């Protein structure tokens, strides 16, 4: 390749990167120092394949703390009567890999991440753990570049809807306990959890299936066995609750139909008696 062609290719790549960063910054609402944003988007698989570049792991560590602080402060102020244990469970319902990944998907964050070929080939751009880690790294980058107030504003914008939804649904409670109470009410038996783990020791991913009466009603993934089981319990709770609501709705409609039919029959009988 000639030097001119190489220069043209490099310039085109740089222009595409800059355009991509501008798009992401528009979604975030902040313009960040270029090198800092690049680092926040650099997964270690890309760094290792390109000569040991800096990864986003330190920024992820920082962003995790910023996210935790802002969410904890919000919960503390909005739920003055909740004890520490329930506040912790509410926070866990918001700050977990699945919730972070969903927020990341809303930003289409996966399309901006710098991934190695191996991760790229195995669907890494939509992998919950990678999306969650990258989102935390981006929050860390906003904190370093713009300060705590800006990072806090970003966290509020992205996570306040989740906090409100979780509070309204009672997600601050223990999902495993909620599932056990629901299955007892529905006469389904006691839930059990089958957990598998994948990945190296320093980065394990746990997958849990919530089973009741031999039937799997929900699955979940997380960085710990506890998180995976909670996610699976939530998924199963929603599935069983939805099915129960549908049955109740069908029963109510059937009862209404029967009542209307009985009313019509009575009306016909009354009309017959009157004509006689």
UniProtKB/Swiss-Prot annotation:
GO CC, any one term: cytoplasm
Residue segments, region Disordered: 217-276
Annotated compartments: Cytoplasm
One Pfam family of this chain: Ribonucleas_3_3
SUPFAM superfamilies: dsRNA-binding domain-like, RNase III domain-like
Obligatory cofactor(s): Mg(2+)
Residues making up the signal peptide according to the UniProt record: none
Lineage: superkingdom: Bacteria
Any one of the GO BP annotations: tRNA processing
Residue positions of the active site: 64, 136
InterPro entries: dsRBD_dom (IPR014720), RNase_III (IPR011907), RNase_III_dom (IPR000999), RNase_III_sf (IPR036389)
Xref: SMART domains: DSRM, RIBOc
Chief location bin: cytoplasm
Keywords per UniProt: Cytoplasm, Endonuclease, Hydrolase, Magnesium, Metal-binding, mRNA processing, Nuclease, RNA-binding, rRNA processing, rRNA-binding, tRNA processing
A Gene Ontology molecular function term of the record: double-stranded RNA binding
Domain RNase III, residue spans: 19-147
E.C. number: 3.1.26.3
Binding site for Mg(2+): 60, 133, 136
PANTHER family linked: RIBONUCLEASE 3, RIBONUCLEASE III
UniProt xrefs under HAMAP family: RNase_III
Family: Belongs to the ribonuclease III family.
Biological role: Digests double-stranded RNA. Involved in the processing of primary rRNA transcript to yield the immediate precursors to the large and small rRNAs (23S and 16S). Processes some mRNAs, and tRNAs when they are encoded in the rRNA operon. Processes pre-crRNA and tracrRNA of type II CRISPR loci if present in the organism.
Subunit structure, interactors included: Homodimer.
Name of the protein described by the UniProt record: Ribonuclease 3
């Amino acid at each position: 390749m000639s030097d001119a062609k190489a220069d043209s290719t490099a310039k085109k790549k740089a222009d595409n990167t800059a355009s991509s960063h501008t798009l992401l910054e528009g979604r975030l609402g902040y313009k960040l120092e270029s090198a800092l944003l690049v680092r926040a988007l650099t997964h270690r698989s890309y760094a290792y394949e390109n000569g040991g570049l800096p990864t986003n792991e330190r920024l992820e560590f920082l962003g995790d703390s910023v996210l935790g602080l802002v969410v904890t402060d919000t919960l503390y102020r909005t739920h003055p009567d909740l004890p520490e244990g329930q506040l912790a469970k509410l926070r866990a319902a918001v700050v977990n890999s699945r919730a972070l990944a969903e927020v990341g998907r809303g930003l289409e964050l996966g399309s901006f991440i710098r991934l190695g070929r191996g991760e790229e080939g195995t669907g890494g751009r939509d992998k919950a753990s990678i999306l969650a880690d990258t989102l935390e790294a981006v929050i860390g980058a906003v904190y370093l570049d713009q300060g705590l107030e800006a990072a806090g504003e970003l966290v509020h914008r992205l996570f306040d809807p989740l906090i409100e939804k979780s509070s309204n649904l009672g997600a601050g409670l223990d999902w495993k306990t909620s599932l056990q109470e629901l299955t007892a009410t529905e006469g389904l038996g006691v839930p059990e959890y089958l957990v598998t783990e994948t990945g190296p020791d320093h980065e394990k991913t746990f997958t849990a299936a919530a089973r009741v009466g031999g039937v799997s009603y929900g699955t979940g993934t997380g960085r710990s066995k506890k998180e995976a089981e909670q996610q699976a319990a939530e998924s199963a709770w929603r599935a069983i609750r939805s099915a129960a609501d549908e049955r109740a709705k069908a029963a109510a409609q059937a009862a209404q139909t029967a009542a209307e039919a009985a009313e019509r029959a009575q009306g016909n009988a009354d009309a017959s008696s009157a004509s006689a």
